[in-house]
């Protein structure tokens, strides 16, 4: 297959700088992207070639404005284009720079005392929940072995008449009972 004869090629240089498409013919020493259009031999349609400078062009954030322009594949502004190419121009506006320190998660500092307090509160709630589960699961126990109204405090001395403990039939034996505080409501006593 024979190579086609070499013909002079006219090139129109379109420069994209800072996101705007311009038709200027000069080259700047900035990082920029060039669009070259060159006609092919024996065809009315030209080839579209893209070239880029060695340094990458960093694009900032959007908003985006779109503009459509007609470009003749032959590059000749006087001749009507056979098949026009439609190019969209993106105009990007810079946004605020992001500081790496601002991207790190901002966690409030909690004191050790607050952590210990939260842990002990959680531990008390866990123990109370376990006690309630044990109480629920012990439904087979005789009714006199569980006392929900027994106070957490030991009974007053025999000479003190201010507090009267519950009747002896509901009072658990001291050696086999366990009392758990459940907040403002009182205590749960579990008997084995």
Curated annotation (Swiss-Prot):
Residues 142-176 are annotated as: Disordered. GO terms for cellular component: chromatin; nucleus. The keyword Transcription applies. Predominantly expressed in kidney, pancreas, ovary and testis. Detected in brain and in many other tissues. InterPro entries: DMRT (IPR026607), DMRT-C1/C2_C (IPR031577). Coiled coil: none annotated. The keyword Transcription regulation applies. Keywords: Transcription, Transcription regulation. GO terms for biological process: regulation of DNA-templated transcription. Belongs to the DMRT family. This is Doublesex- and mab-3-related transcription factor C1. It comes from Homo sapiens.
């Amino acid at each position: 297959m024979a190579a086609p004869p070499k013909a002079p090629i006219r090139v129109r240089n379109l420069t994209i700088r800072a996101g705007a498409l311009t038709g200027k013919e000069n080259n700047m020493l900035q990082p920029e992207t060039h669009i070259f259009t060159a006609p092919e031999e024996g065809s009315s349609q030209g080839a579209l070639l893209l070239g880029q400078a060695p340094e990458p062009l960093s694009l900032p954030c959007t908003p985006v404005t779109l503009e459509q322009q007609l470009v003749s594949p032959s590059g000749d502004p006087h001749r009507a284009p056979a098949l026009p190419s439609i190019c969209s121009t993106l105009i990007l506006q810079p946004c605020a720079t992001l500081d790496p320190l601002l991207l790190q998660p901002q966690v409030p500092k909690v004191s050790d005392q607050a952590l210990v307090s939260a842990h002990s509160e959680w531990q008390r709630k866990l123990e109370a929940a376990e006690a309630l589960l044990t109480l629920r699961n012990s439904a087979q126990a005789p009714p006199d072995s569980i006392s929900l109204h027994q106070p957490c405090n030991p009974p007053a001395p025999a000479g003190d008449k201010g507090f009267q403990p519950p009747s002896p039939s509901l009072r658990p034996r001291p050696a086999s009972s366990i009392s758990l505080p459940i907040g403002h409501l009182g205590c749960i006593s579990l008997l084995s």
